[in-house]
Swiss-Prot record:
GO terms for molecular function: metal ion binding; ubiquinol-cytochrome-c reductase activity. The main subunits of complex b-c1 are: cytochrome b, cytochrome c1 and the Rieske protein. Component of the ubiquinol-cytochrome c reductase complex (complex III or cytochrome b-c1 complex), which is a respiratory chain that generates an electrochemical potential coupled to ATP synthesis. Heme b b566 binds at residues 109, 210. The chain crosses the membrane at residues 45-65, 96-116, 129-149, 164-184, 192-212, 245-265, 277-297, 304-324, 339-359, 366-386. GO terms for biological process: respiratory electron transport chain. This is Cytochrome b.
């Protein structure tokens, strides 16, 4: 029997829409997008972070329908969501745990980029947009942490906003402007609620830019070499969509475990106490994803020095494409840098641990050494290793 090979006639309605708004052509581009054939499961993390962002926006919008941004009612409105709103407990825990899962995916995404040199030419702007997304996430998460108006929310807002007072000449003015008064109060809560609602949509716009930059030169790969021929690539769909769904399955299993069994494991019990400006908690601790930077902040005895180091530890990431002088991207072919990378990862984990400890000895001294190594790795070790390291021979093809 002869097989009918007549091409399928396109749908007239789809053609009409596509001519005016090429949304179907855009989706076709995504499904036929050529991707390096050797990507491993670490390349799932971008898609996982995208799913996490969608979950945060959906749950956040629904929670905002029941939340009251007023210092006299905010704490009670959160408790009412937990007790009286249908599945309110699930919405709140999904949103709270989802923030941690989002940051976990992004931190692993950044670590993968550092290991495989995804910040190197021609992907510098892709890396920079990613760091801007990370900064916007931090601002969004900080403001969201204030909204339940518990003890840790109030005092966390007080401590972090007070950091701007370290800026010479204009610091006090900035703090008063942020507060909308002379202390953290109702205007502060309203501003933070408004910005917390707005910033996720700005993150979506930045993610779109991130994807445009990604599609300009394509994904990096574990070997860190450029695609040289069509045989080095495969279509994104179905090969990597199926692989992504495996990653989603693992992600949602971990996500569900924390929601249903340990929803408050990553939080702080003091935030179940209503905010009281007259009682300072014994130990003010931010969320876990801020702890490494909090440790760097506390490592400096001077307030201004700590603020500069904390922000510098993030902004220095913008310089990585030029600080790393090696022509080889992947750490698989850079034995010395690979060792330095894992020491750097251990240092970041140590800073995270130290950020959660009381501001006393020996934690302060260890924090100083760990903060020094953080900057030493990025500003000194990275350029020197790239200059003097002898990499292994690179393969000719994927």
């Amino acid at each position: 029997m002869n097989e009918d090979i007549t091409p399928k006639k396109p749908n007239a309605i789809i053609e009409w829409i596509d001519y005016r708004l090429p949304i179907f052509a855009f989706l076709k581009h995504f499904s036929h997008y050529q991707t390096p054939k050797n990507l491993n499961y670490l390349w799932n993390l971008g898609s996982i972070a995208g799913i996490a962002l969608v979950i945060q926006i959906i749950t956040g919008v629904i929670l905002a329908m029941h939340y009251t941004p007023h210092v006299d009612h905010a704490f009670d409105s959160v408790e009412r969501i937990m007790r009286n709103v249908n599945y309110g407990w699930l919405l709140r825990y999904t949103h709270a745990v989802g923030a941690s899962m989002f940051f976990a995916a992004v931190y692993l995404h950044i670590a993968r980029g550092l290991y495989y040199g995804s910040y190197k030419a021609p992907r510098e702007l892709l890396w920079h947009i990613g760091i801007i997304i990370f900064l916007t996430m931090m601002a969004t998460a900080f403001m969201g942490y204030v909204l339940p108006w518990g003890q840790m929310s109030y005092w966390g807002a007080t401590v972090i906003t007070n950091l701007f007072s370290a800026i010479p000449l204009i610091g006090e003015f900035i703090v008063t402007w942020l507060w909308g008064g002379f202390s953290v109060d109702n205007p502060t809560l309203n501003r933070f609620f408004s910005l917390h609602y707005l910033l996720p949509f700005i993150i979506v716009a930045l993610v779109m830019l991130h994807l445009v930059a990604l599609h300009q030169h394509g994904s990096n790969n574990p070997k860190g070499i450029d695609v040289k021929s069509p045989k080095d690539t495969i279509p994104f769909h179905p090969y990597y969509t199926v692989k992504d769904f495996v990653g989603f399955g693992v992600y949602f299993i971990i996500f569900a475990y924390f929601i249903f069994y340990e929803p408050n494991y990553l939080g702080h019990p003091d935030n179940y106490i209503p905010a009281n400006p007259l009682v300072t908690p014994a130990h003010i601790v931010p969320e876990w994803y801020f702890l490494p930077f909090y440790a760097i902040l506390r490592a400096m005895p001077s307030k201004l020095g700590g603020v500069l180091l904390m922000f510098g530890s993030i902004f220095v990431l913008f310089l990585l494409p030029w600080l790393d002088t090696s022509k080889v991207r992947s750490s698989n072919y850079r034995p010395i840098y690979r060792m330095a990378f894992w020491i750097f990862m251990a240092d970041c984990l140590l800073l995270g641990y130290l950020g959660g400890q009381p501001a006393e000895e020996p934690y302060i001294t260890i924090s100083r050494f760990a903060a020094c190594y953080y900057f030493f790795h990025v500003l000194v070790a990275l350029p020197l290793i790239g200059k003097y390291e002898k990499p292994l021979p690179l393969p000719e093809e994927l």
